[in-house]
């Protein structure tokens, strides 16, 4: 036998590895292990005196929990994957395996760095591209691709590792990386959650999945550069030409594109880009390549655009007729008129071979379009000479490329010679409306503006601010006129983003379009002439100074100059623009207008103005001015307009749809209509309509809550949410409402928590002023930092964020909330919101109620109807209410949910199911020593049980008219009047607001019958019954008799027949089937019965201490019990659905000891089996209820109405009615202490020839009803007690003896 010493036993107990791990600090906040000191070698010991972190996880293959304090870490690169270990305070190394999923994101950058070091150590000559490809494969489990930004976070670790490892120090990438010392940069595919909300971010916008889908839908518009016909980083023109261009030389360097010649800063300064052709409305004819005016507003247009929505080419009418070679002059003139009218589809939309249209869904019938002339082919009709690859034997060069155009082939037809260097035809096909002389002038102006010396000289030469302003404008405008210009708004850059700072608008004048292209050079020439003229005006300086002093001081003039929006007086105007650009106003120089020499006071005041302007006008203030609020983000042009919608596309698509519709109305064929307007255009225009509708809502309807899709939760629903949520709050917690609206939630929560003795903190955020300012802060939720709130272990966040399109805003608000790691998130969000358990966050769904907010649960703030009443919002698809708990709090919160019946399986379930569960839970509530029934006082408030029963009746779609019998006639109140006395405002448990409720009381919810029917038709509410604990409080000095268990409280009937006999009892008190009601209301001598939330009802009690049988059943007739309509039979399905109540009751009272037991079933023929199917219900004697119903004789309401079907006992079936006399029939099944079970309806009284009341002259009480199944006899008779029963008369009350 092998013995193990103590040291080896200790080794077995030491954890060797940790899985599902994470690290936390003393505040139980997750931290990265990289913050610990690193131990590079065995010789180098780490000082463990510093504060360490706690390692949490599982060890021993996940079987044992792990909780260790660690002080250092190390890594090992010798294996296939980097291995990380941490050193405990006991100097034991623990290897780290797989981290917890939510913790993996926190240490992702460390893992990327270690994988990089390992790869570069083994491959010193590896390139940067090879590194990222390797890391992408190794770390593909993470959503974010590895990048240089991950290494920047640990540049110190990389530098130290390179010092200690020779192979790593020889890595080319490491040398370049450490030499360059890079900083974090924005990556094209990097996601930034704040971009959708904060316009001021310097980072570029990253499209969401939905935006990428929109880009795919938008690809049928041109997506290649108009100069080089290649893709890449392109800038789209906002005008009608629908073209795109490479903006910088770098963007077009792969295809040797001349590009637009901008630099990166200039591109970022562009808001909306219009090419020079669209800016001046001077376009090229796609056939002859000559420029011509396209401005048809003055009737002088020369070129006209093709009407197709996706075609941006212009044509001279005579060029089209000449190309088509129409021999008939009349046909040519008709075609020209059609072209001028804007109803012409160019030859590009017909195959040059078969002259048929395009079918994009069929690859063979897709078009191959030439980029130099209006010629197209179907793929199947493409000539052999237009090849996708070089054929050297036949001297055929590549003329076709697939994949550059959406569902099309890009070709150069044989009419265009291919340049061997460019591999495309000569690129002289794009002409802008400016001359070569202007290009030279613009280059000179650019050189001067970019030179510091040039700028200083310009400032010395131009002293007049008016002249300086006009010269600046002229230079700027001449620069923009020579290059593709920009306008206010946003650029449509296909794969990039520009700054959001708007450009200043410039006023222009429209001119004759026929001479626009001749006037551009004149502007620069006349500007220079004005500058020279300004230099000659120095002779009048003294006169101007004297005149200025005599009229107004220089400081006032300067102040008025800075305040005036247009300080330059209009003089001569050089018109150089069109619809998009308006003309500059250049003031001619007036004598004496030059600024005189400044005195000391003026200089001081001027410097003060400059200093103030420098302090106040900063980039931060400008960005803040144009900042878009969070709830407006889905309506901003950054998210909607700039990427997919341009003015040219919208106008062209609308015009195409109108033309196509006109063609169809005039009898044209569908093919011609499709050539004008493709099916994809119709789909796209509908998407644009939806997007623009959302975007324009704040402008069309004002900046109101509803314009941003906001709606508020009704206070009644908020109160019910508070009643659920307050159980989870602890002292010192902080309740955060990140979109508080009217700020009702925190107020209600505060009142509830104060009532329960808890003190919490509150933070409420919104962009709009709240109705009340209880801890309210008008602030964007996206700007809230962790320093402003408590630690996550004390945070409870919610509740109703703005939804946004496809829950986009809800997802953003939740993502922001997860940064604080609150212990609880309670949310009202649409169903399409991304679930927290699908995110990489450690949150567990505690419960979810999908029907709680159905119906009119919301209202529209500030909106009223014609009666000045608040408009309510009815949800077609109600948003679920859900409560999420952080994983380390989940067990605690689940226990709270179970205790208060909040779990998902309970929330939103039907009343019937809840009552059944409560009944099953209360079958045997007492121990063996407490088995006697007379120790259990059992009385229930009548109205309360009537509430529960009535709700169940409503859920079964049975129209009921209930009558609540009281001991006194004055106590017969209808349910509606009773509720009016109590007040209508109740919390979720049915209690009146502002009143406390005893913990042992039963939760119930009271509504009017119509409200019940409406609520239950939408979603059944839960009837929650609390089970009281068995304490000494259950015993009372005034004891109820054991017979009180037969008390019945309510008489419910759909109809009550008019009988000639009065009932002995007006209504029998009924017991509930749940144990929770036991001992709640104890009947005492000369006292009142307390009901849950109900007014006290006085009862006449006899003087005896022990409750007798007489005082239970002695009732007085009431007017409400008489003169009502005949009763209609219950449906069998109703009794079947409720039979389980009696099963629970029978088990309950059949198991309390020898004093009570259920009767033995009688012998029945074989045709009466005990139970032969789930839908056929039997009582304990085996009688089927399939025959139940009302026979020829009707049951009078004077007997208290038909008893509650749940509470009434069943009779024997018709088969036994005439077989034996009444008493003999039941004799074999009784003993002295047992009663036979009664019918579901009260017993039929003996008929009397006259009178309206069935009198009981001896005032004997009626026999008590034993517990029963829910069956009845067609005749309604029920057996009486054993005649030998000591408390009753010999007849058992059936006759007056």
Swiss-Prot record:
A motif (Nuclear localization signal 2) lies at residues 492-499. It comes from the Eukaryota. It holds the Pfam family PHD_NSD. A motif (Nuclear localization signal 3) lies at residues 610-617. One of its GO terms (molecular function) is sequence-specific DNA binding. A motif (Nuclear localization signal 4) lies at residues 979-986. GO terms for cellular component: heterochromatin; nucleus; protein-containing complex. Zn(2+) 2 binds at residues 285, 288, 316, 319. Zn(2+) 3 binds at residues 306, 311, 346, 349. Zn(2+) 1 binds at residues 237, 241, 275, 278. Keywords: Chromatin regulator, Developmental protein, DNA-binding, Metal-binding, Nucleus, Phosphoprotein, Plant defense, Repeat, Transcription, Transcription regulation, Zinc, Zinc-finger. Disruption phenotype: Impeded use of distal polyadenylation sites at intronic heterochromatin (HC)-containing genes (e.g. histone demethylase gene IBM1) resulting in a lack of functional full-length transcripts. Abolished expression of At4g16870, a transposable element (TE) of Copia-like retrotransposon origin, associated with methylated status. Strong reduction in RPP7 levels due to altered H3K9me2 levels in COPIA-R7. Disturbed expression pattern of NLR (nucleotide-binding, leucine-rich repeat) defense genes due to abnormal H3K9me2 hallmarks; some being repressed, including RPP7 and RPP4, but many being induced. The keyword Zinc applies. Residues 475-487 have a biased composition (Low complexity). A zinc finger (PHD-type) spans 222-281, 282-352, 351-417. Gene3D superfamilies: Zinc/RING finger domain, C3HC4 (zinc finger). Residues 526-547, 969-990, 1096-1109 have a biased composition (Basic and acidic residues). Residues 471-547, 562-598, 969-1017, 1085-1109, 1260-1297 are annotated as: Disordered. Signal peptide: none annotated. A motif (Nuclear localization signal 1) lies at residues 445-452. Interacts with WNK8 in nucleus; this interaction is involved in developmental processes regulation but not in RPP7-dependent disease resistance. Interacts with EML1 and EML2 in nucleus. Component of the ASI1-AIPP1-EDM2 (AAE) RNA regulatory complex composed of at least AIPP1/EDM3, ASI1 and EDM2 and may contain CPL2, AIPP2 and AIPP3/BDT1. Binds directly to AIPP1/EDM3. Co-associates with AIPP1/EDM3 to histone H3 lysine 9 dimethylation (H3K9me2)-marked chromatin and transcripts at a critical proximal polyadenylation site of RPP7 to hamper proximal transcript polyadeylation/termination. Cellular antisilencing factor and regulator of genome DNA methylation patterns involved in the regulation of chromatin states. Together with SUVH4, monitors repressive epigenetic marks H3K27me1, H3K9me2, and prevents DNA-methylation at CHG sites, affecting especially the expression of transposons and developmentally important genes. Collaboratively with ASI1 and AIPP1/EDM3, the AAE complex regulates alternative RNA processing (e.g. alternative splicing) and epigenetic silencing (e.g. The PHD domains recognize both active and repressive histone methylation marks at the intronic repeat elements in genes. This is Protein ENHANCED DOWNY MILDEW 2. It comes from Arabidopsis thaliana (Mouse-ear cress).
